């Protein structure tokens, strides 16, 4: 019994030590509609949380109705013991249309353009590597820019976890939950169809919901 208790204690201490030394890191990406990017990354191993927001512009305290030159972005907090920056950038590229310079799918304009933010020289090099590998696979130029450190402004509360909200809203199809409205929007916008057309078998690699529909 003494040996069993000792082993249990050792395992407990080891687990606690590992948890204490797990480092949470962040990645900020712009991929068009932030509801969609948030959902995709909340279905990726190692991601702790994905938060919708705004970045890349000059306006302080942007809002959905007034965000100036900001893009819709998502801040992805991840456990660096489980995944890493390069892996997440690889996944991101395969969830968007990296050949579109003017927006994403049915959403057009600066707000919906893609971007990857690198906060360190190491992250910049990793992002450049991911883009080069993506271009080699596609045989096309990836127009998604890699930009530097940026201030992240969190979006309004109603945008967070929009894809799974049960709150009702009135749409042209009648009263729907936000989750239902989100699914209709995503399908009508052609997001998944275009990503699969572009990336083929690599589309949504690493995103667990991709096999079940979005």
Task: List where the protein language model places each region.
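Bacterial N-terminal signal peptides
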Residues: 4-16
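Flexible coil/turn and secondary-structure edge motifs
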Residues: 21-214
């Amino acid at each position: 019994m003494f040996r069993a208790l000792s082993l249990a204690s050792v395992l407990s201490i080891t687990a606690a030590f590992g948890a204490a030394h797990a480092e949470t890191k962040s990645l900020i990406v712009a991929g068009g509609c932030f509801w969609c990017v948030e959902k995709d990354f909340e279905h990726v191993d190692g991601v702790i949380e994905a938060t919708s927001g705004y970045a890349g512009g000059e306006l302080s305290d942007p809002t959905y109705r007034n965000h100036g030159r900001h893009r819709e972005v998502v801040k992805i907090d991840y456990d660096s013991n489980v995944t890493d920056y390069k892996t997440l950038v690889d996944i991101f590229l395969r969830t968007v249309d990296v050949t579109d310079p003017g927006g994403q799918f049915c959403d057009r304009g600066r707000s919906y353009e893609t971007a990857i933010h690198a906060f360190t020289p190491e992250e910049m090099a990793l992002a450049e590597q991911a883009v080069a590998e993506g271009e080699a696979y596609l045989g096309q130029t990836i127009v998604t820019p890699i930009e530097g450190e940026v201030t992240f402004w969190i979006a309004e509360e109603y945008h967070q976890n929009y894809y799974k909200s049960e709150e009702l809203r009135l749409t042209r199809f009648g009263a729907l939950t936000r989750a239902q409205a989100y699914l209709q929007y995503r399908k009508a916008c052609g997001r998944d169809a275009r990503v699969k057309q572009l990336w083929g078998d690599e589309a949504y690699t690493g995103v667990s919901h991709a096999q079940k529909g979005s």
